Structure formats: structure tokens, C-alpha cells
Amino acid sequence: MLGLNNRFRAASILSRQLFVHLTLLFLSWLAVPPSALQAQQIRLPSAKGGVADLSAKQQRRQGDLYIADGDVDLHYGDSRLQADHVEYNDKTSETIARGHVLYDYENQHLEADEVHYNVSTGRGSFRIVHGTIKIERRPNPTLLLSDNPLYFEAQEVERYPGDVYLVRHSWITICDPDHPQWQFYAASARIRLDKTVALVNANFRLFRVPLLWLPYATAPAGRKVRESGFLIPDVGQSSRKGFIFGDAFYWAPTSWLDTTVGAQYLSRRGASERGELRAKPFEDTSISYSYFGVDDRGLKDSTGVRQPQGGEQQRLEIDSKLPWGWRFVTDYNQLSSLTFRLAFADTFGEAINSEVRSAVFATNNFHGFSLNFAALNDKNFLTINPQTSVILRNLPEARFGSVEQNPWAKLPIYFGFDSFVDGVHRSDNLVDTPLTVSRTEFAPRVTIPLHIADWFGITGTAAFRTTRYGDSLNNAGQVGSVAITRNTGEFSIDLRPPTLERFFDRTSLRRDKNRRRYKHTIEPVVTYRYVTGVNNFADFIRFDSNATITDTNEIQYGFTQRLFLKEGDDQPRELLSWSIFQKHYFDPTFGGAIVNGQRNVFQALNSVTPFAFAFGPRNWSPIVSDIKLTPGGRYDVEQILQYDPHNHRLVTIGTLLKVKPYSEFFATIAHFRLDDNPSVSDVQPPSPLPAFQQPLSNQIRALAGYGSETRKGLNFITGIGYDFTNKTLQNQIVQASYNGGCCGIAFEYRRINLGQVRTENQFRIAFLIANIGTFGNLRHQEKIF
């Protein structure tokens, strides 16, 4: 009994002690002010009339100064300042923050030990800083872009209104700041958002190893920013040019004008100069000019004598929309010699282009009429040793014409016309005309379209053409001052028989698949054409296609088959097309225009194929077949075949295949073969094969790769150009690159083989810095072929 009472007394004592402790705890909780349990929040005035929101665990006021401690959070407009300790002056808006300071404004984030900042003006200073600034860049297919912000660390940062930062003793990168692949160390840097990043006394480091010192460097820091200054130097090696070193200066004085001027030192050749100007002074006017030249010492030949191949090329382009519907266009091109282009063109495709064309014209189209004034010049280089060329010039030229117009609404009769007046010139090894040969032409026409029911169409066109040339060729093929006139009558009938159609419905048995419907069509076409009145074809000087009109009596016939696919409610798309056509000539001599023993080129022939096939009288043209397979997606195929019934063989084979079998893989193959030389029977009377055979052609271009120039990860591309006839590898390229999140590296090997003029091996390397540019001599904007 005594033990039970003792246990009960002990339990009572414990209960009283617990009650006392709980009571004291409750009273102490009631004694704590609310401000001690949560952050104090107040609204403070600023110097410019704005309002700053301040919250902290503890804060007090001393005159104009508010002092806050503990999780301090200060908001003013779009800016935010967080710190352990903040002193704010509501008269001047000056703020001092210390301890774990965080500053945020739009896409700017800074962390510092101490900050002096004016919330009203946005000006401040930061000490012991690391931060990020998000810089938006405009998409660029030739520039590696990264979504990473600009990271930097600095001893001191000054911020100025207008989003301008002056950074001292800093490093800058867009890589992972803990493991940066590259960094810029700069004694001083200026960052102007949506403008530029400028570095003073900087050095570039790769994996923390200093590689390049720059006294001053700038880079764009916005979507539409152009910054004047020197570009990244160009360094490389070539088997024919030697060691290459160059640089260029970019100048953008206004928002509508920029220019680039640069030069390269070529240790084995001399020096090259480049220039480019772009301008858009008005909304509808654009101007561009480019120049490239080489002062070449030349390479030594087998006798030890240097053979210079230098020269220059330039191009001027102007496109402007003028008042009252006028448009003015200039495309002026100048090339000093084909040898220069073959020797110094950057790519194989540029090197083998032997044509230089220039045009200046003003045009106005109104109410179905067209008025044009032009100056044209076409120079085609033929050989390089000796250098020969053909020059064709139209200066000046005025043309006036109209489309078919119907003056009577109830009658299907349409009228139109073409006319021109110009001065023309031709210069080659055989013909050299005066500087200006006058020429005029007027050609009215009438067109009558007829429809038999709704399934058969007939369109007839009749035209009269009168043409006068101020000079002509005499019987010896020499230019004479005798004027010549041509009056031709032209008639054509275009027959459109009904299109044959058949539908195939392959309805899917699965409800989750779209219904597929196919349509197969056969479209026949027959065109008859008759031209008479060209009685002296050999007397006309070949200035352009106008001089190649001949008498003809011909019919062209053929058909086009198409296969369409319609999936669900989508629009139909063409999967396959196959066109076959041929011409029959009732007059095999074309009014006596055919010349035996030479290639004949005029309108009645080259309207079928661009390759000469008539070396004597012909009744039949080659049969032309054009097949296009375009299912979309993984592959596209086109093949052109030309079969000559006179020679009983395929004379032209052209094949183009584009494949994208999987993911980022792609391949393009183009093969072309031409064998259209005459047979013995082409020459009347039959004789051994003449010496006028046109060159054979059998070439292939192949390009395959994975990825793209600016894709993240591993990318590669390889291509060749091979000439089967000459058994020559004309062009070869191998390019491999790897792009990371903030940088990339690329290697390239090129070989260009142009016979005795140029056989060159090029080795290129580039280091790509995301959002900035490329170090090295590999320029992604260059075309491979």
C-alpha cells in the first residue's frame, strides 16, 4: 500500500512539472512580437518617385537610412537585390548590400560579396563577382550557337544605365564555368547588352592554356548587331600557295551599310586582296559589291621560269524598285582571265565556270504590256593557252511587248506582239563586228484557243516576224556592211487530247491509319510548228537565239504520266512523273540551213535538247525521257535519257539521287554521260569520221555525310568528283567536325585537279567558338561543289 502511494505521488509531481513548463512556453510565445516570427515588409519611397519593397527579418530606421538584416529582399521595378545586410537611403535611392549578395534584372544575374547600387538609376558597383548574362543571337547557319548564357568572374564590376557593364580583371566564357573548354582573360571588358562585348588586353585560353593575346577584341552581343573591327586572322597551308596568313577589317558605320576589306600573304605566290560592300540605303534598294585579286609572282615551270597566273574579278549588284512601277537591276561581272579563276578560285565549282555575264536593265510591266531598257554583255572563255573567248553584247536595247489580250469578250481571239530595237556586237576568232550593229524586229501574233466539249483542246497561233540586221556575213563568212532583212511567217497548233485517269483506293483496314488513294494520269500532247521565210540563214551573224531561227516543218509529240497520292484529308502530292517526247522534221535540211560536217545549233534543234545532235540532214530528233520519283522523305530520284534513233544508241544519261536513309545521314550522287558524236552516215557523202567531234563527257559527283556544320556532336562529310573519260579525280573533300555545347573543332582536306593549270592539296582546320565565330581558315559558308 505504501509503495502504491509513493508511485501515485511521483506521477502527480511529474504532471505538475509538465503543466508548468507548457504554461511558461505558451506565455513566452505570447510575449514574442509578430515581427520576430516573420520577415518585416515595408514599402519605401525612392528618389525618382518610384516605390521599393523591402523585406527582412530585422530592420530599423536611422534618419533617411533603413538598415535591414537577415534574408533581406529589396524589389524595385524589374530589379531585385538580396543580401544578408542592406542599407537603403530613401532620399537618394543609394543601397549598400553585403554578404551573399544576389542581383537579378531581366536576363542578368550577378552574385557578389559587396554591392553599392542605386535602384532609381540602375548604376552600381559590385566586388568579387561572378554572374551570368543571357545574350540572344540571331539564327545563323554558318555559326555555332549555344543557349548557354555568358559566364564571367571579376574582381570588380561597374554597372551603368542602359545595360552596360564594365568588368575589370575577369574571365569570360559560355562554357560550364566549373569545367570551361575555353576562356577569355581580360584586364578590362565592356558588355553592352544587345550591342557588343569588348575585351581589352585579353588572352584566349583553351583548357586553361594561353594560346592567343589580343590587345582589343569585340564580339556581337545581340540578335541584330554588327560591330566594326578586325576579324579573326586566317592561317593555313596549301601545296601551291604555301603558308597563308591574312586578316580583314569589318566596318559598319550605319545600320544600312557595311564593308569588309582584307588581304592574305601567300608565301609561294605573293598577296591577295578582298573587298566587299553591302548597302540598303532605302527600303526597296539594295547594293552589293565584291572584289578579289591576286598579285602573283607565279610558280616556276620545268625551265625555272616563273609563270604568273594573277588577275582580278569583281561583281556589282543593284536592285531597286522605282516610282511608277519601274524596277532597276544591275548585275555587273568582270574577270581578267580564265587562268586566274582556275588557279585561285576557292572551290571546284567556281573554278570551272567559264562564263562571265553582265546585265543592266530597267523594266516596267503594266496592263499586260512590258517595257524594258537593257545593256547586256556575255563573255565565254574557250581556251586558256592561247586565251580565246566569245563576246556577245547588246548595248543599248529597248524591248516592248504584250501578253495575249482579248479585245472581244465573246470571241476567243487573242492578240499580242514583241518588238525590240538594239545595237549588238560579237567578237571571237572568226567574227569581229563593228562596235554596234543596228537591229530591229516587230512580231505581232494572234492566238485562238478552241475546246471541243470539255475533253479536247486546240490552240492555234499565227505570227508574222520582220527583222532587220544592219550588217551581215558574206559568202566567205566575213562581216560586211550589207543590211539584211528577214520576213517570216510562223504557225503552230497545240493539240491537247483528253487526259486519261484511273483511281486506286487502298483503304486501310486499321482505323488508326489514314485512307490512301492513288491517281494515275496519262497526258498526251501534240504540237505542230511551221516557219517559212528564212531564205538566207547563213548570212545572219549569231548574236543570240534570235539569229538562229530557221525554216522548219515539224511536229512534236509525247506524253507525261503522273502518279498522285492522297492520304486522308491532305492535299494530293505527286509521287512519280515520266515524260517522253520526240520531234519529227518533215524538212530535214531546215530550208537549207543544215551544214554537213559540223555541229548545227539553232532553235528547231535545241528546243528538244541542249546538246548538238545534227551533223547533217535529220528527220528525227533524239527521244527524250525524263523520270522523276519524289515520294518525299528518304529519297528523290531523277533520270534523263536521250536515245538517238539515227545512231541507234543512248547519247545522254543523267542521273540524280538524293538519299536520307536514317537520322542525320545523307547522300547525293549525280552522274552524267554524253556520247553524241556523229556516225559516218551523218556526213554526205559518207566519209571517215570528221575532226569536228564534240568532247565526250562521263563524270560523277558524289557527296555523303552525317549531321550538319553547326549540329551538336560528331559530323562528317566526304565528296568526290571523278572524270571517267580522262580517268582523273577532279575534286575531293573530307571534312570532320565535333561540336560541343560551347565550342567545336573541324578538320578538312581538299584536292582540286585542273590539269596543268592547277593541282592543289589544301589542309584546313578551324576552332569554333559558340556565338562568337571561328578561328582558322575553314569557312563553312563556302560551297563544297
What kind of region is each of these model predictions?
Residues 57-60, 88, 158, 706:
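Short, exposed beta-strand/loop patches in secreted or surface proteins that constitute
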Residues 17-33:
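Bacterial N-terminal signal peptides
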Residues 108, 114-172, 177-179, 183-188, ...:
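Outer-membrane beta-barrel proteins and related beta-barrel translocases across Gram-negative bacteria
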Residues 37-39:
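Boundary at the C-terminal end of the N-terminal hydrophobic targeting segment
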Residues 42-47, 53-56, 69-85, 98-112, ...:
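Interaction modules related to DNA damage response and DNA replication/repair
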Residues 1-16:
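N-terminal secretory signal peptides that target proteins for export/translocation
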Residues 60-82, 87-98, 102-104, 109, ...:
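Structural recognition of beta-strand segments within beta-rich domains
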Residues 41-48, 243, 629:
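Extended, small-residue-rich solenoid/repeat segments and analogous flexible loops
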